[in-house]
């Protein structure tokens, strides 16, 4: 964490990202033959570190000036980066997309529909407006679709609803690292 902070100060124009284990607690499964006891695997995941891991991965696909602070053990078992990249949803102003297609894309990349509470890795549909809280961001995006055409893409604070910035395009990355091809 200290190195991450130092690199952010040293390289303010670069995407300095943090990719470490997201477990606050991890107990592997085990067997104690003396007492014939099986201990189940138990763990606790840190949601903020999971967000930072997904942010690091999305930055690697978006930018050329990325510095990732990580431990070596974290790079194993992430799955195929080509498959992950194929799942990215590119939203662009004036592009044609139906409500049902966007809903299907979001579900395919592990976002869950929740029309009540907007939280990380969820989306909701309010008429022709999609509100999506990317897994790797601290801001949500609002996509306004009219007549199957993207009219606007705006980032906003998911708690207050305050709009922050308009986008001409937005790349929406999967909500998990572990994804598979539909086939």
Model-assigned labels for residue ranges:
Residues 1-183:
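ASCE RecA-like P-loop NTPase motor cores
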């Amino acid at each position: 964490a200290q190195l991450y902070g130092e690199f952010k100060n040293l390289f303010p124009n670069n995407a300095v990202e943090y990719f470490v284990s997201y477990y606050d607690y991890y107990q592997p499964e085990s067997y104690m033959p003396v007492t014939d006891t099986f201990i189940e695997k138990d763990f606790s995941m840190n949601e903020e570190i999971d967000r930072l891991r997904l942010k690091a991965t999305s930055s690697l696909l978006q930018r050329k000036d990325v510095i990732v602070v990580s431990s070596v053990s974290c790079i194993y078992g992430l799955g195929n980066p080509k498959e992950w990249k194929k799942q990215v949803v590119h939203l662009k102003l004036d592009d044609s997309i139906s409500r049902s297609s966007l809903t299907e894309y979001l579900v395919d990349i592990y976002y869950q529909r929740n029309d009540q509470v907007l939280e990380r890795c969820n989306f909701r549909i309010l008429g022709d407006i999609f509100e999506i809280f990317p897994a790797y961001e601290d801001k949500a995006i609002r996509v306004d679709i009219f007549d199957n055409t993207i009219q606007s893409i705006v980032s906003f604070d998911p708690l207050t609803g305050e709009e922050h910035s308009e986008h001409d395009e937005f790349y929406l990355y999967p909500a998990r690292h572990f994804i598979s091809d539909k086939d």
